[in-house]
């Protein structure tokens, strides 16, 4: 019998404004040092600016932005016969959303604008139009996947 305690997944509550699990996860990725209130203010500010600029529903905009950035495959390395191969693996929706949110947050921090709010707004608008660093990162991943399609029959 195992002596370890069972791990129970923490339940993430939907965000208060839109009632969406996806937006609550996005806010959690933005959050730094446990300051969720600040992360919510940053996210809702950036969403309001984007919806004003593009004249569209903010919830639909976020779904479209995440769809533009999310990958369908992931690369894993496996050692076969003394050499490592990059093997493309299809991933589920939750994992692809996780990658897209992480990429957007990471690449928004690299932008050259004043304040994180403006950086996030710029990255989200560029992601909507497929011009952002996040979409370029997705395209680079797709190139690697195309190069290594021959190894897709290997099991991990």
Curated annotation (Swiss-Prot):
Entry keyword set: Ribonucleoprotein, Ribosomal protein, RNA-binding, rRNA-binding, tRNA-binding
GO CC annotation, single: small ribosomal subunit
Keyword presence, Transferase: no
InterPro entries: Ribosomal_uS7, Ribosomal_uS7_bac/org-type, Ribosomal_uS7_CS, Ribosomal_uS7_dom, Ribosomal_uS7_dom_sf
CDD domains: uS7_Bacteria
Molecular function via GO: rRNA binding; structural constituent of ribosome; tRNA binding
One of the GO biological process terms: translation
One protein family per Pfam: Ribosomal_S7
Function: One of the primary rRNA binding proteins, it binds directly to 16S rRNA where it nucleates assembly of the head domain of the 30S subunit. Is located at the subunit interface close to the decoding center, probably blocks exit of the E-site tRNA.
Subunit structure, interactors included: Part of the 30S ribosomal subunit. Contacts proteins S9 and S11.
Record-stated family: Belongs to the universal ribosomal protein uS7 family.
Protein's name according to its UniProt entry: Small ribosomal subunit protein uS7
Species the sequence originates in: Carsonella ruddii (strain PV)
């Amino acid at each position: 019998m195992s002596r370890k305690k069972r791990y129970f997944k923490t339940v993430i509550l939907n965000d208060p404004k839109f009632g969406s699990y996806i937006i609550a996860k996005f806010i959690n990725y933005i959050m730094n040092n446990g300051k969720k209130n600040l992360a919510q203010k940053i996210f809702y500010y950036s969403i309001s600016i984007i919806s004003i600029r593009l004249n569209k529903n903010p919830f639909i905009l976020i779904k479209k932005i995440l769809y533009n950035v999310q990958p369908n495959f992931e690369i894993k390395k496996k050692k076969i016969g003394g050499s490592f191969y990059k093997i493309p693996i299809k991933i589920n929706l939750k994992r692809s959303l996780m990658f897209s949110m992480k990429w957007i947050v990471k690449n928004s921090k690299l932008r050259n604008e004043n304040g994180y709010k403006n950086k996030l707004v710029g990255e989200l608008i560029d992601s909507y139009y497929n011009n952002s660093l996040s979409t370029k990162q997705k395209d680079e991943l797709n190139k690697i996947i195309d190069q290594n399609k021959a190894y897709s029959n290997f099991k991990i």
